[in-house]
Amino acid sequence: MNTPKPSILIIDDDESIRKVLTEILTGEGYNVESAATGKEATEKAEAKLFNIALIDIKLPDTTGVNLLTKIKETKPKMRKIIITGYPSLQNAVEALNKGADAYIMKPLNMDKILATVKEQLQKQIEEQEMTEKQLIQYIETRAKQIELHKENKP
């Protein structure tokens, strides 16, 4: 059975960064789409399921943190990685508090990006497996409760 390739949405107003990231991530076997604005990113995220969004902190029509909040509301399982050229502890803390799963500094180190993407995909898989285990456990518990209820009825 073929496992679908993970999908990544790159959100950055710098066309050269979008192109380089698209080329490298596609070469690693990922399905990649990109957006230059928050509006375009929101439309793409609503139309398709992405495993990961790489979000620039500064976009022409919004901030990465605002976009992060918006995406988190509609796509809570999508992993969100903030990319910034503004090395500030305040930016990092704010992004993480608003739901970023990771934070990468520019200039971009491709090894760091690939490692972070793989790490976030693994966490996504682990969360999905945990959710499935919890669901199975709930169903088994409910089945036992129903069975006990039937046995105790006259």
Task: Report the location of each language-model feature.
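Active-site residues of response regulator receiver
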Residues: 56
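CheY-like receiver
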Residues: 123-154
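C-terminal output helix
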Residues: 108-117
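The feature encodes the CheY-like receiver
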Residues: 18, 60, 84
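Short amphipathic alpha-helix used as the core "switch/output" element in two-component signaling
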Residues: 43, 65-77
